[in-house]
Structure formats: structure tokens, C-alpha cells
């Protein structure tokens, strides 16, 4: 095996994480963390969708749906749900409060898995709008990152009940002018895009074309699932090479 990260997660680090699961990881503590919030499951277009629905104690709070990406889950939001729903408890003001909805994307977490193709960004955006209306929110905002950013942008473009969006991964194509006369900053961005396409996107090709073939190995082996995901945490997070940070 290669001892560095040039070909993926090193064996030594894989063993370290597997040992942590066996000897230190406490699922019940994680369960307590998640159970601080209100969890529900509903059926949208034939797929069971799990979501957190945390209403603010402030009645005039603004409804907000937050969407995660890959490799991620609603766990990403456990540190912000309470400050968003009850800002006065964290030094904020009542006018900044939100009623927060955090759905798990189809096939993620406790959500069901679609049995047929078609659950792309547009269908998920439509389903999220349906979910918010079912919860009584005829006017709401949307936030997301990674695939959640794509879903959020689609909600903002095509869905009438959403009045505002925020993404932490804005998506846009370079203009022809910027391609012909790029600034140094744009050159750096284009080089990063080229690197991603050539060296960092193999997972996406496999998952988007033959997910079932890959799925057998990931479902059968917890360590395989961990290795597939932790390599992306190492590569994409601002963690100084230590995903546990």
C-alpha cells in the first residue's frame, strides 16, 4: 500500500479509524445529540423522506429549509439549528429567528432510496417545496451547500413559494471573456477546476452512472464506506490534513 494520500486513504489511517470505532466510538452519545431535535418521516412522490423540523419559540420566525450535500448529512447542521431557531439564547435578536427544516436527501441517512431514476436536482427541489407547503409554510427561504446548493438554486429559480436563497457553494459558468482574458485569481480557479475534473471526480462518475455496482461493497463493508467518504473529508475540508479536526 502507498503510505501517503496520493492514491487515497493510507492503510495506517484506515486502521486507526476502524480501531476508534471498535474501542471508543459511542453511538448512544451520538443518538442523544441527534435526539435534541424533532425528527419526522413523510412520503414525497413515493419516497420516504426523513427531516428535522425545529420550530422556533418565536412565533414570527421565518421558515428556512437547509439542504446538505455529499458526502454529508443533516449532522452537519447540529451546531447551528439551535442558534437559528432561538437566537436570543445565543446573544442574538428575536427578529433573526427561523423555523428550521433539514431534510435528508433521497438515499441519505434515514431517507428512503429511490427505486427508479429521475430524482435529480429539479425533482428534489419540487419535493422540498411540497414539504414546506405541507408544513404550513407558504413563504420560506432556502439554504444549501454542495448538492444542497444546486437544489437550493433550483428552488429559487423555479419554485414560487421560496422568496430568498443562500448558498455556500455558488455555481456559475465562466464567461467567454473571463476564459479569454482571465485574471490571476481566475486562472487559479480554472486550474483548480481542471485538477478536480482530472484527478478528483472519479467518485462522481461511478456514483452517477453505476451506483448499484459500487453500493454492494459500501453497504457490505463499514470500513469500505468509511474509506470512500473520509478521503473526501481529507481532500475537501479545511482540516490541515487531519479530518478529525
Specify the residue positions occupied by each region the protein language model found:
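Catalytic cores of eukaryotic secretory-pathway lumenal/extracellular enzymes that build
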Residues: 2, 12-219, 224-226, 232-237
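Short, intrinsically disordered, charge-balanced linker/junction segments flanking boundaries
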Residues: 241-245
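Short His/Asp/Glu-rich catalytic/ion-coordination signatures at enzyme active sites or charged loops
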Residues: 1-7
